[in-house]
Amino acid sequence: MADERSGKGEDSGKLLYCSFCGKSQHEVRKLIAGPSVFICDECVDLCNDIIREEIQEATTSDSSDRLPTPHEIKETLDDYVIGQTRAKLALAVAVYNHYKRLRYEDKKGEVELGKSNILLIGPTGSGKTLLAETLARLLNVPFTIADATTLTEAGYVGEDVENIIQKLLQKCDYDVEKAQKGIVYIDEIDKISRKSDNPSITRDVSGEGVQQALLKLIEGTVASVPPQGGRKHPQQEFLQVDTSNILFICGGAFAGLEKIIRDRAEKGSIGFSAVVKSQLSSKSVGETLKDVETEDLIKFGLIPEFVGRLPVIATLDELDEAALIQILTQPRNALTKQYSKLFEMESVEVDFREDALRSIAKKAMERKTGARGLRSILEQVLLKTMYDIPSEQDVCKVVIDEGVIAGESEPIKIYKNSEQAKLAADE
């Protein structure tokens, strides 16, 4: 039998076996011969997987050894998010200090450094989520988005706060070590504000109750998370995840917060240096939000303990027409570049005229949806064209002007070797 396994019986027609897994030549697709040894295709695949994993781990550790500086973090954010300089600076410094703190603690330093979680305040579509996503991609750490409106206190219908950590674990294939250095973005945090200043007999399970549940998670605790989530398999051994090194970024529009800030400023303005009321009301929402203080957030409905866990507050400005046009054209993932690429795959060039871009920006401002509304406008405008183009072989260019955005005309299609189409394009 030993002779058969080593392949000595090759000439005599005896069965050949893989020297590694012991499978016969009939059990595998291919058996590769070497000097007195054989290896099957399955073992070759396994070896490739092992080598690939080791290379990937080595590359990841090399890339994560160097922490990007605040300047480099801001430059990367500039590639994807237009404007919002103040928020970018605050995020760059906070994130840099957070991961610097992790490295310092790994070396068992004498001074204990606190965690700087972040609160982003800004209108819908101003770039809060995109900033958090870009940070996670740059730092190559696990990232998850949680919706605060779906969270409830433990024991009530809805998601428990531990589900947030569950989602983070899923992003890194349940690697606890990686998850403990991840970033969690909790969206719509303003929607879990306390419903009223007065304590109520009925429990506020989706408002103040959620804030209380999030307190320890954000500050740092050891959360018990089942490997496959939920409570369906109580016999499973729970994973212990320490959240003290997870960076939490909370974001919300905080509609009405600017009024609370103005009211506070008016009450405090007495004497010769007082700010005139008309000056306060003439300030934009973005400018007013710059002056936000802890007491304003507490009056809005966040409990003091929760606000205390979010020491870094960054406010984002409303996007004006010029900023929306820049968003359409400048970032790496600009919508005009994305649609141009889609048309390019059909060997068609797409030309967005300047007046069309202005018209798209105006429409988005009217809808009050910020940058998020730009894609839906473009999808609506280009739907019929994207439906027709794959079936039309001779189209070489599509021109989008102001009339197309307003719904007054169809996109101009320029055909190969068509004089009429060329004249139409010139007009």
UniProtKB/Swiss-Prot annotation:
Q: Where does ATP bind?
A: 123-130
Coiled-coil stretches, from where to where? Answer: none
Q: Which one GO biological process term can you cite for this protein?
A: cell division
Can you name a GO cellular component term? HslUV protease complex
Which amino acid positions bind Zn(2+), per UniProt?
Answer: 18, 21, 40, 43
Mind listing the UniProt keywords for this protein, alphabetically?
ATP-binding, Chaperone, Metal-binding, Nucleotide-binding, Zinc
This chain's function reads:
ATP-dependent specificity component of the Clp protease. It directs the protease to specific substrates. Can perform chaperone functions in the absence of ClpP.
| Quaternary structure and partners | Component of the ClpX-ClpP complex. Forms a hexameric ring that, in the presence of ATP, binds to fourteen ClpP subunits assembled into a disk-like structure with a central cavity, resembling the structure of eukaryotic proteasomes.
Q: What is this protein called?
A: ATP-dependent Clp protease ATP-binding subunit ClpX
Which species is this record about? Hahella chejuensis (strain KCTC 2396)
